[in-house]
Swiss-Prot record:
Gene3D superfamilies: Vaccinia Virus protein VP39 (3.40.50.150)
Name of the featured protein: Ribosomal RNA large subunit methyltransferase F
Entry similarity comment: Belongs to the methyltransferase superfamily. METTL16/RlmF family.
GO biological process, one term: rRNA base methylation
Reaction catalysed by this enzyme: adenosine(1618) in 23S rRNA + S-adenosyl-L-methionine = N(6)-methyladenosine(1618) in 23S rRNA + S-adenosyl-L-homocysteine + H(+)
Subcellular location: Cytoplasm
Organism lineage string: Bacteria, Pseudomonadati, Pseudomonadota, Gammaproteobacteria, Enterobacterales
Role noted for this protein: Specifically methylates the adenine in position 1618 of 23S rRNA.
Organism, scientific name: Klebsiella pneumoniae subsp. pneumoniae (strain ATCC 700721 / MGH 78578)
Enzyme Commission designation: 2.1.1.181
One cellular component (GO) term of this entry: cytoplasm
Alphabetized UniProt keyword annotations: Cytoplasm, Methyltransferase, rRNA processing, S-adenosyl-L-methionine, Transferase
UniProt enzyme class: transferase
GO molecular function, one term: 23S rRNA (adenine(1618)-N(6))-methyltransferase activity
UniProt-listed Pfam families: Methyltransf_10
Amino acid sequence: MKAQKPGLHPRNRHHQRYDLPALCQAHPDLQGYITLNPLGEQTIDFANPQAVKALNKALLAHFYAVKHWDIPDGFLCPPVPGRADYIHHLADLLAGDSGEVPKDATILDIGTGANLIYPLIGAHEYGWRFTGSEINPQAFASAQAIINGNPGLTRQIRLRRQKESQAIFHGVIHKNETYDATLCNPPFHDSAESARAGGERKRRNLGLGAESGLNFGGQQQELWCEGGEVAFISQMIRESQAFARQVKWFTSLVSRGDNLPPLYRLLTEVGAVKVVKKEMAQGQKQSRFIAWSFMDDAKRRRPF
């Protein structure tokens, strides 16, 4: 009997343990990274960044029909099941307005990253159209290479370069442009030192020493910003006021529950008329995203 992962969204494709033979068929290079755990079961070494990248290539090919996917060394290699959960819960949020999951939704992914993970999943699962913003030139080029390598995606995903280091929505959302929702996985740490300490914790959890030399990935824009995620999301909330009539739902992951109170206070200050929190769980990891809107229920139900 296959074990289920507790807490994943019902529509998430990753409830069962990884079917490694099927994944190897989708991406044969994965075979070279398969080992046996102490129980004699097949697994991969999750401390090996190349093994994790090969697993992601296999998952994206097998479940989401992504034939070309790669990221440069040193960039975040995202856990696919957790990223899929955000997309499915966002679909439920949109369905709450229209009565069903919209098939033609337009979504803005803030900081789409070198991996382009949210647009890849959302385009496949729901047929949504995505705009991905990105400030890092290398990440932008990587995301564009993924789109170009999967011709069917060119009609569903476009990229937009954020040229202003202090801006989030400004310069990305154009005049007269509308979105059903925005999503974002904000930088969590408030300094490079905090980000390094997080990497050390991962090493300890995997039973590795600092001398292991493993790179858990992540560029500065992916991992930290001045003031951490509260500062980043607070800026997002303030900027969102300028686009109150162009976006139905603004959303962002919030990694720590104790970061919510100051964000709720700010949402009240800026006049958000509806605020929703969606709790998520992937195995032992608890996460959540908050969503806010400046439109009442009747306005959100109407198409742009």
